Amino acid sequence: MSNYEIMILANPDSTLEQVSELLFSVLKKSDTKIEKLERSELAYPIHKLTRATYYLVTVKSDPQLMAELTRKLNIAKFILRSLIINLDSEKGLKPRKVKRFIPRAKNNDRSANQGDRRPFIRRNQTTDASKTEASTEATASKQSEQTTTKPRTRKVSKEQ
């Protein structure tokens, strides 16, 4: 025997007796609790109706009886929609893991955080002194070549 919760949207002209008669034709009265919730406006029309009455039913029953009840709810003309939830097998929401708050250091000095920082090193660079000297000489020669070339001049038209 499992616990079930049934939400029923019924025609607003239907009565509690009609709904309970339909439910008790399948279920036992001792294990069933019917609660009329409210009559409210629907978000969209169902069978050309814009209002419906909500019923909440809690039941302790066998799955075979719930299958029969589902069939009868689908056949009944005054039932607009129904939803059956097995409360025993429904997992529901799990609580979130809360991340712990770690406050920042109260000192806003940059010197306090210097121990955490590492200098940026390119992967191609090495610490060998001979290679660094060679690379500086190469860059110096490239710069001197760039300065020896003539700069481009823009032609200005005299028609302006």
Swiss-Prot record:
<protein>
    <recommendedName>
        <fullName>Small ribosomal subunit protein bS6</fullName>
    </recommendedName>
</protein>
<dbReference type="GO" id="GO:1990904">
    <property type="term" value="C:ribonucleoprotein complex"/>
</dbReference>
<dbReference type="GO" id="GO:0019843">
    <property type="term" value="F:rRNA binding"/>
</dbReference>
<dbReference type="GO" id="GO:0003735">
    <property type="term" value="F:structural constituent of ribosome"/>
</dbReference>
<comment type="similarity">
    <text>Belongs to the bacterial ribosomal protein bS6 family.</text>
</comment>
<dbReference type="GO" id="GO:0005840">
    <property type="term" value="C:ribosome"/>
</dbReference>
<dbReference type="Pfam" id="PF01250">
    <property type="entry name" value="Ribosomal_S6"/>
</dbReference>
<comment type="function">
    <text>Binds together with bS18 to 16S ribosomal RNA.</text>
</comment>
<keyword id="KW-0689">Ribosomal protein</keyword>
<dbReference type="InterPro" id="IPR014717">
    <property type="entry name" value="Transl_elong_EF1B/ribsomal_bS6"/>
</dbReference>
<feature type="compositionally biased region" description="Low complexity">
    <location>
        <begin position="126"/>
        <end position="145"/>
    </location>
</feature>
<feature type="region of interest" description="Disordered">
    <location>
        <begin position="96"/>
        <end position="160"/>
    </location>
</feature>
<keyword id="KW-0687">Ribonucleoprotein</keyword>
<dbReference type="InterPro" id="IPR020814">
    <property type="entry name" value="Ribosomal_S6_plastid/chlpt"/>
</dbReference>
<dbReference type="InterPro" id="IPR000529">
    <property type="entry name" value="Ribosomal_bS6"/>
</dbReference>
<feature type="compositionally biased region" description="Basic residues">
    <location>
        <begin position="151"/>
        <end position="160"/>
    </location>
</feature>
<keyword id="KW-0699">rRNA-binding</keyword>
<dbReference type="InterPro" id="IPR035980">
    <property type="entry name" value="Ribosomal_bS6_sf"/>
</dbReference>
<keyword id="KW-0694">RNA-binding</keyword>
<dbReference type="GO" id="GO:0006412">
    <property type="term" value="P:translation"/>
</dbReference>
